[in-house]
Design a protein with these regions (language model features):
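Gram-positive cell-envelope targeting signals
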Residues: 1-4, 22, 36-37
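Positively biased amphipathic helices and basic secretion/translocation or surface-docking motifs
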Residues: 1-18
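A residue-level detector for the "anchor" residue at the start of short, highly conserved motifs
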Residues: 13-20, 30-319
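Active-site-proximal cofactor/substrate-binding loop regions of enzyme domains
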Residues: 26
């Protein structure tokens, strides 16, 4: 078992950029710059490259057991101690599987998998459903599903590939929402510091509820819950813009720099500061590999010629 969900299609439906060759950076209205990684040539004003090469996301997570014991899954000794427990999952390279856990585990046993900033992790639940947890996210789940339903609890962002079982429906609780799932692939983004909770459906069907309000999603549609107004709405979206992260890509479509760097800071575990307030609103479109070093991302952004970066460890100052 490796640390990437098996059988998922690669990003294919975004037509605006060539994944192999071109990144378009937009600032303001009507201006832009193209970069060809194959040749290393910029068409437009050439930027000055500064900063270090910082690593991309790592397969790192903390597992909290039912008795409160915390296991750092990077720690070999901790993993060995975990393997001796009755409810022990199988620990692979960047992945955790509960398929082999026996039914003798206590009914009330719940575990929590927490992925820190700069990390990501794959979880295979006892029923074979697969979850890819993004950085700064956590999922609480039963070690064994014994009830007439399968229910997990999410904070942050995750991509789900749920095993179909009509006799035992699958639910994801994301405060204050409940998402009911059939055999389905979909993503949920529910970071506490963000106003919107996004449920993006790739295949199958889901039902999203907030109290008495509920919406049904078909593929390529997204449920948007606004925490500030408690309203629930549905829109048609290009799912790749919201789910490309599971395939190891960073895609932003005409987004403010502040939003882009907040997301990248979460992926690379960086603290972002701004020496000039106006640069927060500069708009960019980016399509790059998520696991490139951060230095490569800086090169692309600096190539626009209107911003620079000062790097000190994991602290980035935007100038």
């Amino acid at each position: 078992m490796n640390g990437r969900l098996a059988g998922y299609r690669r990003v294919s439906r975004i037509k605006k950029w060539s994944y192999a060759a071109v990144v378009l950076l937009l600032i303001g209205i009507g201006s832009g710059l193209f970069y060809d990684p194959a040749s290393g040539v910029f068409s437009g004003q050439q930027g000055i490259v500064t900063g270090e090469n910082l690593p991309g996301a790592k397969r790192h997570a903390i597992l909290t057991l039912g008795d409160g014991t915390e296991i750092d899954l990077k720690d070999e000794v901790a993993r060995m101690n975990l393997s001796k427990r009755q409810e022990a999952p199988h620990v692979g390279e960047g992945a955790l599987s509960y398929r082999s856990v026996t039914d003798s585990v206590q009914l009330s046993e719940y575990h929590t998998l927490q992925v820190p900033r700069g990390g990501e992790y794959v979880l295979v639940l006892a029923d074979g459903s697969e979850v890819l947890l993004n950085a700064e996210s956590k999922l609480t789940f039963p070690v064994v599903f014994r009830e007439k339903e399968r229910r997990v609890y999410l904070e942050g962002e995750a991509y789900f590939k749920v095993k179909k079982n009509p006799a035992c429906p699958f639910f994801v609780e994301v405060k204050p929402l409940e998402v009911e799932v059939t055999g389905t692939t979909f993503g949920i983004r529910a970071y506490p510091d963000e106003t919107d909770v996004l449920t993006t459906l790739e295949t199958g069907t889901v039902r999203v509820r907030n109290g008495e309000a509920e919406v049904n999603l078909s593929p390529d549609r997204q449920a948007i819950f606004d925490r500030s107004t408690t309203t629930l709405s549905v829109g048609e979206v290009d799912t790749d813009l919201f789910l490309a992260w599971k395939d190891g890509r960073i895609i932003f479509d005409d987004c403010p720099l502040e939003k882009i760097l907040a997301e990248i800071g979460r992926w690379y575990d960086l603290d972002i500061f701004y020496a000039r307030e106006e640069v927060r609103s500069y708009r960019f479109s980016l399509n790059i590999k998520r696991h490139e070093t951060f230095g490569e991302v800086l090169k692309l952004l600096e190539a626009a010629g209107q911003i620079g970066f000062e790097v000190n460890g994991n602290t980035i100052v935007v100038r």
